[in-house]
């Protein structure tokens, strides 16, 4: 049973070819946008790689980049075919590439869907990766002399200033770690000794945050040391006053930032998917309607176009049989070539 059959006069085929040409180049433009958005997300993930536990989130930009690149190539091909369809002799050169094109176009649509699914599915993975990565970044903040962690302090300070955030979930995350290196502590000082002895793990903990947590918009000089001690600062109440440090955690800030980029990527991929599907359907109609035209004399004849010549199940079975036959013929040719080589030796 033929699915979605339609009759095409010469004028309708011309309009179909023109529409396909327009859709093809729109698909190329959107493919370029999708490719660029994927590259941008990839770069942003790479920039903050030090505060992430793993790189599983990179699957999203990788898929988006693939979808954009394939969309560009298929759009260019479809545009060339639409131009060649006005000349039977030129069109004959493209006919043999039609089935591989349809196969790749369907794969491209599936890649677009995969990119959309990954954008949603990997949000939880990204959040967990940021949670662990930021926790480690805060813990290793002081290790500026340790190989592999030399730039951890710079990365964390830049992150907190750029995203106006402090700590992992909140500024108190800094209270739980020793973020000042021992090389900068005066161990002859009674205050330092008492603070280290008061801690079970022998760490120098204090209710303070790095300078990068300070809010420069605050009219008051930044209170970054002894934050919870009201008596240490004039006219200050930790419980009721608005703190002049950033109170939002960096995990929330980064997750919100990446979620926004992924949403934009999702919109670009969705548009790319719709255009590629439209190009696929239009080219299929053009191909099947041109299939019965054998020469220039038949160009103005009325023809029929369709999406599938048989039902979905029958088409899939036929395609599988063709692929199986092609695979078997390749095996036979390989075996014959091996036998001839053995006989010659």
Curated annotation (Swiss-Prot):
Major place of residence: membrane
Cytoplasmic side: 1-24, 81-99, 291-345
Glycosylation sites: 54, 229
UniProt keywords, alphabetically: Disulfide bond, Glycoprotein, Membrane, Transmembrane, Transmembrane helix
Domain of life from the UniProt record: Eukaryota
PROSITE patterns listed in its UniProt record: RDS_ROM1 (PS00930)
Transmembrane segments: 25-43, 62-80, 100-123, 265-290
Compartments, record wording: Membrane
One Gene Ontology cellular component annotation held by this UniProt entry: plasma membrane
A biological process term (GO) from this entry: visual perception
Distribution of this protein across tissues and organs: Rod specific.
Cleaved signal peptide residues: none
Record membrane topology: Multi-pass membrane protein
Tagged with keyword Transmembrane: yes
SUPFAM superfamilies: Tetraspanin
UniProt keyword Coiled coil, yes or no: no
Stretches assigned to the Lumenal side: 44-61, 124-264
Subunit-level organization: Homodimer; disulfide-linked.
Family: Belongs to the PRPH2/ROM1 family.
Protein name: RDS/peripherin-like protein xRDS35
Natural source organism: Xenopus laevis (African clawed frog)
Gene name tied to this protein: rds35
